[in-house]
């Protein structure tokens, strides 16, 4: 399965809620060198494969070969591997896409179901949706999260006046994370925008730049 959508739409929260339904291993990728990313990845896998993080893996191929050999097989339901923010890993190690393709195509890896998630629309497109993409046509489920509609904002922020709802939606859009931040602010909409966005110390002051960097 592949889940994509711009930053702050709630992909990680959705994955965490979903993973509670059955055996699952969540790996949240971060930026860094290829070696540090593999080490962190292996540490996360140790939650399912004890001792997995105690080994140094020189390549992604060796890591996934070891993973396939040790991944649980005896449960009534397969243990799912969730890789969140996959583009961080592929940006550092372009070969990882082909390694994942090999895992999906290899019958010996059928007991390792994958859920891949990412915020970079350009990179997720290149990994999964382009006809030349390594993983093209291999996902059984494709989910693209969209911003929430304006009809959801009033109840979420306890706003009743239609004009106030429209103004708030113009400021925060349909992004759940922004709504949560706005709900914790004192004062009116302008006070919240000033505190969160316009202030140099505001949580969202550099948000536009961060979103654009995701697509570099």
Regions found by a protein language model. Name each.
Residues 1-216:
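Phosphate-binding site recognition
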């Amino acid at each position: 399965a592949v889940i994509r959508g711009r930053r702050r739409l709630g992909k990680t929260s959705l994955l965490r809620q979903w993973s509670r339904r059955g055996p699952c291993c969540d790996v949240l990728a971060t930026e860094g060198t290829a070696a540090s990313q593999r080490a962190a990845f292996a540490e996360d896998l140790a939650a399912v494969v004890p001792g997995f993080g105690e080994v140094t893996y020189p390549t992604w191929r060796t890591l996934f070969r070891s993973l396939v050999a040790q991944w649980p097989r005896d449960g009534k339901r397969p243990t799912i591997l969730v890789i969140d923010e996959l583009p961080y890993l592929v940006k550092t190690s372009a070969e990882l896409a082909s390694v994942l393709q090999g895992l999906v195509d290899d019958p010996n890896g059928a007991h390792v179901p994958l859920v891949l998630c990412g915020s970079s629309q350009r990179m997720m497109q290149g990994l999964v949706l382009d006809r030349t993409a390594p993983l093209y046509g291999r996902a059984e489920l494709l989910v693209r999260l969209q911003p929430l509609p304006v009809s959801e904002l009033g109840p979420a922020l306890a706003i009743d006046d239609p004009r106030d709802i429209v103004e708030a939606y113009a400021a925060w859009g349909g992004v759940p994370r922004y709504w949560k931040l706005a709900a914790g602010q004192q004062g009116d909409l302008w006070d919240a925008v000033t505190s969160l966005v316009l202030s140099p110390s505001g949580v969202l002051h550099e948000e536009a730049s961060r979103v654009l960097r995701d697509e570099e």
